[in-house]
Every structure is written in structure tokens, then in C-alpha cells.
């Protein structure tokens, strides 16, 4: 049984496709249960964010597992399998572990070092726990990934590269407004309308406040949540008020920016709602989109959304920063420790089976000896039993210690399989994952099932 990841991110797919695969809590729960309904899959965890959709699962068969995950994604999203094949990537065994550590550390994010992904992975883990879909493998891997992410952010200066996609979006908006994002209070004298009251909206309000915004207007479907967000802004020293969600358009003629992060089923900002001649900077932080792209066609209206942020991120790519090198060193260290522990755990069943077989052989020989030498006294027989068992234990001690040490090292040898072959042990249900870190599409039953997109790893530089 090995961990398998089938996913899609801003590095492998267009935003329009990521939107179609985006999952709310309800869809994620249904999809998780559908995954567990497949015979090849025994655990499941889904990470769904603005920039990625990744299915983490444990499978008994690589080929069948990949096919099952792709079919479930097709059923959940309505995206045809041929389209999915062109954009999905696959990570397996040690490569899957490395990928999760890199992702959770913010090293595969659109904004290098962003911290939101740690919370998103934690939320995905908690949800999977509630669904009952997390077992020993995903529990161990996720906890290691979260620990690694914390180390990366506390032991390096990676946070300086960019706190979140929200800060990136606000900075891009400032640039497009002709303002200096490095200035002390570039938004001084400006007013912003924030739609939504969740984590993204709260972060947006915080960043707008740090940029010196003079006034904030909050609107949310649940009025009380908008009022709480306004109270927090007031406590931070930023004047804030609340408008009814249905009356949000009435505020357009008195604001300079509109930031939307609601995840609504319909557009929150439409061209027909914007007053003629209005000068507006629109920032869309939702997936699927909150703001109709057609708004950007209006005179005086500009738009920043996730798709445009992706483009800006790709165009602004640069070499690896020292903090990123330090972060990757931590990932390598934690990955080595995790995979070593996993290989040791994988070999324990084979070692136990070997000891049971040796004990059984010893017992059989003692029984035969007892029948051939019935005159041995109980005291003498007790010494014979102790001696035979002591010899068996001593003979097995060094090999079992050594095989655990060897298993802890990375390599292509499966030591539990070697023990089974050498000593004729019965095939065990728990087998070690291969140390392979890459897979070719040609190895799959249908060579076109997935496009293997190389995400950054602990041994590669970032795109």
C-alpha cells in the first residue's frame, strides 16, 4: 500500500479548468466517499484551493488507483476524462511524500512562501478525519507535512517572499492604479468595498489597512459576519461601515476599490451594476470567479483576478532565493526522516513473520526431540527448550537489526520482499512502497491517462 497523489495546479492547468474542479465542503465530502468506494483505494484526503485540486489517497495498485481517481474526478466535475488526462499530474510513494511537504511549505505556491496553504492542508486533513477517510498512512504523512511547513516558516525568511495570494493581489492592484506599493500608505485617501467575510476577505481587509486605506465598507450575505469584520477593522484603527449585501452596488460610486471573495454561485459584480463613468479597481479572489470579466471592458474599470495573477507570477519568476534554498534543505531533512521511518515500519511485518516462522520451526523440532527422548527429566527438558529458543533468538537478532537499518536507507531494494523470498514467508498485505520518484506515462495502462508535470521538488529548482 502506497500513497498516491493525482492533482492539478496553477502550474499544470488553466484557471478555467481549475474552476471546474474546485470543490466546496459538500462536493469534497461526496467525492471523498466516492474515492473510498473504489476497491483499490483505502484512504483519501482532498486539498481544494484557488490554485490547486489534489487527491491524496492510499492505493494497493498504482495503475488501478490512478484510473479510479481520474474516473471519480470526472464524475464529480463533469470534465471529460480526455481533458483531465492532459492536465493532471501524478506522484507516487516517496515522490508523493516529497510533493506534500513541498506544497505545505508554500514552495509550490503561486506566491512563494505563502502561509495560507498550511491552514488549507490542515483544514483538508480535519475534514477527511470527519469523513473517516484518513488512516495511518495519510495521518503520518500529513502530520509530517504540517510540521515541515511550520519549520520552514519559523526557521527561514521565506515569509519575506510573500505572505499570501491576497498580498500579491493587493500589490498588483496598487501597481495597476499607478500607486507605489512600497510607499508607507499608498491607499491613503482611498475607500474600498470588501465583499465576503471569510478568511480571504478578512486578509484582504487587513492588507488594505496596512496599505493605508482611509475607509472600508463591508458587505456579506450574513449581515452579522460583515459587522464583525467591520468591528475588527475599527479595532485596528481603520474606519469601517456595513451595507446590506443586496445594496452593495449602491456603494460603487463612492469607492476606489472593490475586493470580492465570496465563492457565490453567481457573479457578485456585473457590468450593468457599475455606474457609468465610475473609476474602479476590481480585485477578484474567488474560485470560481466572483467578478464578471466583462467588467474590465468598461472605461475606467480595471480588474485583477486569479487568472491574471497566475500570468503575473509566471512572468515574474526568478532564480532561487537563499531562503528558498534553506527551506528546501528542511524539506529534504524531514523527507529523509519520514521515508526512513516508513521503510522501517514497512519491514516490521516481514520481520515478525520471520520470527514466528523460526519459533514454529523450533517448536516442531522440540516436539520431535521430546518424542525420541522420553526419558529426559522436566528440569533437563526446560533447559533444552531455553537453549533452543535462545539459539533461534541469537541467530535472528543480528539479521533483523541489520535489515531494519538497511531498510531505513533510501534505495530501490525492497527488504521486506527480499525476506519473503529468501525465507519462503507468505506474501504480506503491507509491502514497502518503491523508492521510485518519477513515473512515465507509458507505464500506465492507457499511456495518455495523465501528463506528468514536474512540480518543484526538494532536489529541483523552482520554475
From Swiss-Prot:
Enzyme class: oxidoreductase
Catalytic reaction annotation: (S)-4-amino-5-oxopentanoate + tRNA(Glu) + NADP(+) = L-glutamyl-tRNA(Glu) + NADPH + H(+)
Site feature Important for activity, where: 99
Enzyme Commission numbers on file: 1.2.1.70
Pathway: Porphyrin-containing compound metabolism; protoporphyrin-IX biosynthesis; 5-aminolevulinate from L-glutamyl-tRNA(Glu): step 1/2
Annotated GO biological process: protoporphyrinogen IX biosynthetic process from glutamate
Gene Ontology molecular functions: glutamyl-tRNA reductase activity; NADP binding
Binding locations of NADP(+): 196-201
Keywords: NADP, Oxidoreductase, Porphyrin biosynthesis
Family (UniProt): Belongs to the glutamyl-tRNA reductase family.
Assembly mode: Homodimer.
Function in brief: Catalyzes the NADPH-dependent reduction of glutamyl-tRNA(Glu) to glutamate 1-semialdehyde (GSA).
Note: During catalysis, the active site Cys acts as a nucleophile attacking the alpha-carbonyl group of tRNA-bound glutamate with the formation of a thioester intermediate between enzyme and glutamate, and the concomitant release of tRNA(Glu). The thioester intermediate is finally reduced by direct hydride transfer from NADPH, to form the product GSA.
NCBIfam families per UniProt: hemA (TIGR01035), PRK00045.1-3 (NF000744)
Protein name: Glutamyl-tRNA reductase
Organism: Corynebacterium glutamicum (strain ATCC 13032 / DSM 20300 / JCM 1318 / BCRC 11384 / CCUG 27702 / LMG 3730 / NBRC 12168 / NCIMB 10025 / NRRL B-2784 / 534)
Gene that this polypeptide is encoded by: hemA
